[in-house]
From Swiss-Prot:
<dbReference type="Pfam" id="PF03503">
    <property type="entry name" value="Chlam_OMP3"/>
</dbReference>
<keyword id="KW-1015">Disulfide bond</keyword>
<keyword id="KW-0472">Membrane</keyword>
<keyword id="KW-0998">Cell outer membrane</keyword>
<feature type="lipid moiety-binding region" description="S-diacylglycerol cysteine">
    <location>
        <position position="20"/>
    </location>
</feature>
<keyword id="KW-0133">Cell shape</keyword>
<protein>
    <recommendedName>
        <fullName>Small cysteine-rich outer membrane protein omcA</fullName>
    </recommendedName>
</protein>
<feature type="lipid moiety-binding region" description="N-palmitoyl cysteine">
    <location>
        <position position="20"/>
    </location>
</feature>
<dbReference type="GO" id="GO:0005201">
    <property type="term" value="F:extracellular matrix structural constituent"/>
</dbReference>
<feature type="signal peptide">
    <location>
        <begin position="1"/>
        <end position="19"/>
    </location>
</feature>
<dbReference type="GO" id="GO:0008360">
    <property type="term" value="P:regulation of cell shape"/>
</dbReference>
<dbReference type="InterPro" id="IPR003517">
    <property type="entry name" value="Cys-rich_OMP3_Chlamydia"/>
</dbReference>
<keyword id="KW-0564">Palmitate</keyword>
<keyword id="KW-0732">Signal</keyword>
<dbReference type="GO" id="GO:0009279">
    <property type="term" value="C:cell outer membrane"/>
</dbReference>
<comment type="function">
    <text>In elementary bodies (EBs, the infectious stage, which is able to survive outside the host cell) provides the structural integrity of the outer envelope through disulfide cross-links with the large cysteine-rich periplasmic protein and the major outer membrane porin. It has been described in publications as the Sarkosyl-insoluble COMC (Chlamydia outer membrane complex), and serves as the functional equivalent of peptidoglycan.</text>
</comment>
<keyword id="KW-0449">Lipoprotein</keyword>
Length: 87
């Protein structure tokens, strides 16, 4: 019985993590992105997995995984020499 409960808990935890937007995955501000590019704002884009795939990077256009037309300052390659985002 304990094994069944443990397996159910693990399974539900894994499914839950992959099917929803976790705060640790994407609910943060990309310092290089305009407000519309906040990944939590469009975490459930059609045809795209949940926003766990979002990786904030100044060198990558915001929303490129789901919306190729959405671009922010990242599209201009605004990274500094040390790889951090320019303000």
């Amino acid at each position: 019985m304990k094994k069944a409960v443990l397996l159910a808990t693990v399974f539900c935890g894994v499914v839950g993590l992959t099917s929803c937007c976790r705060i640790v995955d994407c609910c943060f501000e990309d310092p290089c992105a305009p407000k519309p590019c906040n990944p939590c704002g469009n975490k459930k884009d059609k045809g795209c997995s949940p926003c766990g795939v979002y990786t904030p990077s100044c060198s990558k256009p915001c929303g490129s995984e789901c919306n190729p037309g959405v671009q922010g300052p990242q599209a201009k390659g605004c990274t500094s020499l040390d790889g951090r985002c320019k303000q």
